[in-house]
């Protein structure tokens, strides 16, 4: 069974700052330099999007980034090749932080369930987040993922009931992922003050019904929001704002420089 880098990290008494990045965005060849920049700038975990033509929970920035990734040749096989290179230090410094893949069921089914789990594990992936995999239907997938040493992360939303929060906490291998707003990522449709009025009680409710760690994502754009979320949870995920920060890069090295510059503002 492959070594999993997430579990030891969960035992550390620290708040986690997690980066979400769409491979080969905004230009082909950007992935490995950007991963190096994020690791060097203090990302504790890197979440890589698996681009899909019909995402259900992604806002327009991530949807657009996925289309760019697809145009630049990203598919599951090429993404796993990039992870292998990152782990081997081919084209960048050796990437040692945990890597979680986030994507949807259909491409994984098309690839082949056990083939995907085996190839992901061998490439150096540590965890999976599959938004459209219902926890109550995930027993077999969880068992197979565990046999390949892969951590599985499930989502909690503001409308998730306490009993289901407990179920998700029990099923998530190492940590769960709380959506800070009940909307698609990065849309920011709710006023920040309105969100803040509800989010503290929501995360307190999650805390009361979980034993494992949980992190918060969706709409976190700056250090102030990171600090606020980390005061209420075990970590924060920043994705849309990172993609926006590097959107104007014309070369891989420029994308890496922009990623590093932005990420350092969050710490």
UniProtKB/Swiss-Prot annotation:
Pathway listed: Amino-acid biosynthesis; L-tryptophan biosynthesis; L-tryptophan from chorismate: step 5/5
Source organism, top-level taxon: Bacteria
Protein EC: 4.2.1.20
Protein name: Tryptophan synthase alpha chain
Family to which this protein belongs: Belongs to the TrpA family.
Protein function: The alpha subunit is responsible for the aldol cleavage of indoleglycerol phosphate to indole and glyceraldehyde 3-phosphate.
CDD domains: Tryptophan_synthase_alpha
InterPro entries, per database record: Aldolase_TIM, RibuloseP-bd_barrel, Trp_synthase_alpha_AS, Trp_synthase_suA
Organism of origin: Prosthecochloris aestuarii (strain DSM 271 / SK 413)
Keyword field: Amino-acid biosynthesis, Aromatic amino acid biosynthesis, Lyase, Tryptophan biosynthesis
